[in-house]
Amino acid sequence: MDISRPRGTRDFLFAEMRNRKEVEGVLRRTFETYGYHEIKTPIFEELKLFTVKSGEEVVNQIYHFTDKGGRELALRPELTAPVARLYMNEMQKKPKPIKMYYFGSCFRYERPQAGRFRQFWQFGCELIGGRSPLAEAEVISLASESLHELGLDGFEVHIGHLGILRGILGREEIPSELQDRIMGVIDKGDVEELEALLGEVEVSGESRELLMKLIGTQGGPEVLDDVEEYLGGYSESLEALEEFRELVETLHYFGVDDYHVNLGIARGLDYYTGIVFEIYVPELGAQKQICGGGTYNLVETFGGERVESTGFAFGFDRLMNALGMDEENMRMVDVFVIPIQDSTVPEAIRITQELRAAGVSADLEVSGRKLRKALSHADNLGARFAVLTGEREIQDGKVTVKDMERNSQETLPRDEMVDKIKGRC
RNA sequence: GCCGGGGUGGGGUAGGCGGUUAUCCUUCGGGACUGUGGAUCCCGCGACUCGGGUUCAAAUCUCGGCCCCGGCCCCA
C-alpha cells in the first residue's frame, strides 16, 4: 500500500517552518501596532457562504461535502467571506470601526501549477465600518509597512478607484450585471476583449475612448491631473476622483509616497465599491501579485446591515517566495547530553531535565552509541554544546562541557553548569 | 479538459539504440582510529510506478491504468 501526500499540497520541514513562523511573527507584530486583533473562523463553513458571494460556478473548485447531519459544508476557499460572516454573526452591534486580522489556510480544488496549490495560506485584515480616504490610506500604509518590516525589496503598490470607472458606465446606463462583466475584463487587462465587449454593449464612442484611455493611465499621483482632464463632464467619476486625491494626500502623511496610480486595477469582483489596490513583485513573473485589497461591501449580500470594509490579504506562500529566505542548517537543540558509561545514564537524565526546566533546549543520547558516534550526532543536530557525564567527573562533582563551535572543552562544577550554559545560549 | 515532460534503493541521480552482477553521491547501521566527533578507510541495509504484450532475454521496446510536475483555460 502506497500512501502519499495529496496533489497540490506541501510538507514543510523544520527549516522552512522556522522561516514561515518568523514571517508570521513580523506580520502579527506589525498588524497589532496598527490596532488590529486576531480572529479565527472555522476551517469549514456552509457551502452557500461561498456560492452567494461568487456564484454557483465556484462549487466545482471547492472541496465540499455533506456531513452526517445532511448539511452542505465546504472547506473555505478564501477568508474574506468567513470574516464577513463572523462580523455579521458576532460583531454587527459592536461599536465601529472594528479592526481585525486573520491568518489561516484555504483550500481550492484547482489544477496546481507553479506557485498554485490546493492548500494555501492567507494573512489579511479588515477595517469594518469606517470608510474614508483616511481609513483607506491607513490600510494601504499597513500593507506597505509590513513588507518593509520584512525587508522585502522591489515591491510595487498599485492603486485604482472603481468609482471613476463605474461613473462612466453609469452615465451610459449600463446595467449592473454588464458593468460587473466589463470590470472583469478590465481586470484581466485584455484590451481587445474589452473593445469587443464595449462595442457589443453599445457604449458610446466617447465613453469607450475615455475608458480605454483611463485604464492605460499609470504613474505617480500627478497623473490624476491627466485623469481630471480626460473626465470633463462625467460628474460621478469626478466625485470619485476627488476621493482619490484625498487618499493620495493622506498617504503622504503616512509616509507612503512610493506607489503607482493605476486605473487598470479593477479586481474583477462585483462587491468592490471604491479604492482597490494590488501589490506586485515584478521579478516573480506570473506569480508577481502578492497582495490584493480595497473597499467593498459584502455583509449586505449575506443578509446583514449595510457596512463597508476596507482590507487586504497577503498570499502568504507568494510572500515567502518573494522573500526567498535561505533554509540554513538549523540548530535542532542547544545542548546534547551524552552518558559516557551506562552507569552515568541517570545523571545524564537529571542534567537534561534541569537544562530543559531552565528553558534550554536539550536532547539526550538515547541510542547507546559510543562517545565518538554520539559526538558526531551532536554535530548533526547543530548542538551548541555537548555535556559529557563520565564516572570520573561525577565522582569529583563535575561535568564536562564541550563547545561544539569552538571545539574547546572545560570541566565545570556540577551545580554551576546549568547557569553557565544558559548564559551562553 | 488540452498540450508537454516525467515516475530508478530513505533523498538526489546515471543507465534507456534489450543481455541476464543496475552507476555515483548522500542518508542510515556496524567496524578501524584504544573516554572526544566533524576527515579517511572497510563491511552492510536498501531500488527500476501497476498490469498486459513482444522476446531466449526488458529498467531499457510497445499498449493500457494510476500518480507527479510544467504550460494553457481558470485564478474569489
Swiss-Prot record:
PROSITE patterns: AA_TRNA_LIGASE_II. It comes from the Archaea. Its EC number is 6.1.1.21. Keywords: Aminoacyl-tRNA synthetase, ATP-binding, Cytoplasm, Ligase, Nucleotide-binding, Protein biosynthesis. Its main location: cytoplasm. GO terms for molecular function: ATP binding; histidine-tRNA ligase activity. It is an enzyme of class 6 (ligase). It catalyses: tRNA(His) + L-histidine + ATP = L-histidyl-tRNA(His) + AMP + diphosphate + H(+). NCBIfam families: hisS, hisZ_biosyn_reg. Belongs to the class-II aminoacyl-tRNA synthetase family. This is Histidine--tRNA ligase. It comes from Methanothermobacter thermautotrophicus (strain ATCC 29096 / DSM 1053 / JCM 10044 / NBRC 100330 / Delta H). The lineage of its organism: Archaea, Methanobacteriati, Methanobacteriota, Methanomada group, Methanobacteria. The gene is hisS.
